[in-house]
Amino acid sequence: MSTTGKGGKAKGKTASSKQVSRSARAGLQFPVGRISRFLKHGRYSERVGTGAPVYLAAVLEYLAAEVLELAGNAAKDNKKTRIVPRHILLAIRNDEELNKLMANTTIADGGVLPNINPMLLPSKSKKTESRGQASQDL
């Protein structure tokens, strides 16, 4: 005889057998179920495997953590405690791989990287040195 009741669940199970999300099983913070739903309803393919949303969630979580870490460092360098779009832009553009990944991306309110062509900078010539010596000769 089986111990199953009306609902099909075993009677011996306790309340500790709660559902565990796929994000928790994978050890992720990003929602695997939501990403799975987006993949299915987005009509990217007729069928979506069970591992695809887990892998995509892991990749997105890694990229977000990487950008946030670099943006936090940029905020610290500017003596700020809050990350603003400017810090995110500086983080992405100063990292070679992230810059290549997001080359054609515009970040709203990010501004531009500070860059002055060395040719436009005033050159340090001997004229400034001779002025100092001339004043001492008098």
Curated annotation (Swiss-Prot):
PTM section of the record: Monoubiquitination of Lys-124 gives a specific tag for epigenetic transcriptional repression.
Phosphoserine sites (modified residues): S123, S125, S130, S135
One GO term describing the cellular component: nucleus
Sites of the Glycyl lysine isopeptide (Lys-Gly) (interchain with G-Cter in ubiquitin) crosslink: K124
Domain note: The [ST]-Q motif constitutes a recognition sequence for kinases from the PI3/PI4-kinase family.
Subunit details: The nucleosome is a histone octamer containing two molecules each of H2A, H2B, H3 and H4 assembled in one H3-H4 heterotetramer and two H2A-H2B heterodimers. The octamer wraps approximately 147 bp of DNA.
PANTHER family: HISTONE H2A
Identification of the protein by name: Histone H2AX
Gene this protein is translated from: HTA1
